[in-house]
């Protein structure tokens, strides 16, 4: 036991762990938007407005996007980042940065008990020190149990007290089924405000495809006729049962 304690005391961060934790374990989505590295996003204005309305609140200002896989939850975050870059958000949100947090990377390589908690706490401390940052956690239901071991805390228990503090904001995304795991934890559930992201209609999907049409044409070096967009939405909705619009319609066009 003494040798293990000595090893832990002598432990130093690897080279990749030195430096700002947000740069190591996160991705600045607003920076990618500013550099033009994000795909253009279309539609979902209602969900975006609802999310911004929650973000500008004084309390209970942590939205979580709840919807089936492929309906465009991450696209809403990218659209939000683009709006920030173009100053098309309420003044309270101007100049904010959206940083996507990679929980898997925080967990990866944790060799000692308490190392995950140390990494995660470093990230939270940096966010609290920079109130302009909004963190985004995809598959946020995974925070329950992430990093937990006998005698240690999981990410949810570390995050819960921080969510109620001013100067810290978090956006989550998860599926309808997995959100039930958050609902089972009353303390965590009341800190998040769910936003239902429904599957778009065929007409809404066609509008999204029209927006993506120039980038798809440029990538494949072809001309995509308007009828093909309508047909991909109709046929994918009719014959592909295990996936959701607009993702499956985009894949039909991309694979054709």
Indicate residue ranges for each PLM-predicted region.
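Conserved AAA+ ATPase "SRH/arginine-finger" region at the nucleotide-binding site
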Residues: 193-206, 219-229
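Amphipathic alpha-helical interaction elements
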Residues: 108, 125, 197, 221, ...
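Flexible, glycine-rich beta-alpha linker
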Residues: 96, 104-115, 200-205, 232
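C-terminal helical "lid" subdomain and adjoining coupling/linker elements of P-loop NTPases
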Residues: 218-227, 231-256
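Histone-fold recognition with a strong bias for associated Lys/Arg-rich disordered tails
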Residues: 1-107, 117-130, 136-142, 148, ...
């Amino acid at each position: 036991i003494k040798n293990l304690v000595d090893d832990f005391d002598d432990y130093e961060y690897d080279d990749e762990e030195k430096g700002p934790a947000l740069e190591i374990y996160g991705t600045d989505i607003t920076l990618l938007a500013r550099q033009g590295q994000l795909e253009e996003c279309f539609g979902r204005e209602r969900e975006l407005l609802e999310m911004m309305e929650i973000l500008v609140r004084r309390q209970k200002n942590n939205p979580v996007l709840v919807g089936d896989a492929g309906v465009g939850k991450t696209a809403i975050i990218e659209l939000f980042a683009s709006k920030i870059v173009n100053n098309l958000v309420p003044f309270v949100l101007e100049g904010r940065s959206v940083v996507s947090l990679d929980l898997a990377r925080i967990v990866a390589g944790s060799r000692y008990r308490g190392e995950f908690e140390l990494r995660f706490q470093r990230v939270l401390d940096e966010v609290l020190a920079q109130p302009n940052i909004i963190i985004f956690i995809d598959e946020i239901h995974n925070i329950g149990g992430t990093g937990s071991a006998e005698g240690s805390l999981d990410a949810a228990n570390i995050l819960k007290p921080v969510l109620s503090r001013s100067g810290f904001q978090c956006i989550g995304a998860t599926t309808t089924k997995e959100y039930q795991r958050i609902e089972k934890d009353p303390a965590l559930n009341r800190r998040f405000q769910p936003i239902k992201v429904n599957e778009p209609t065929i007409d809404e999907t066609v509008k999204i495809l029209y927006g993506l049409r120039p980038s798809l044409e440029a990538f494949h070096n072809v001309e995509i006729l308007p009828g093909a967009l309508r047909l991909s939405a109709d046929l994918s909705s009719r014959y592909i049962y295990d996936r959701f619009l607009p993702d499956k319609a985009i894949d039909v066009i991309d694979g054709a």
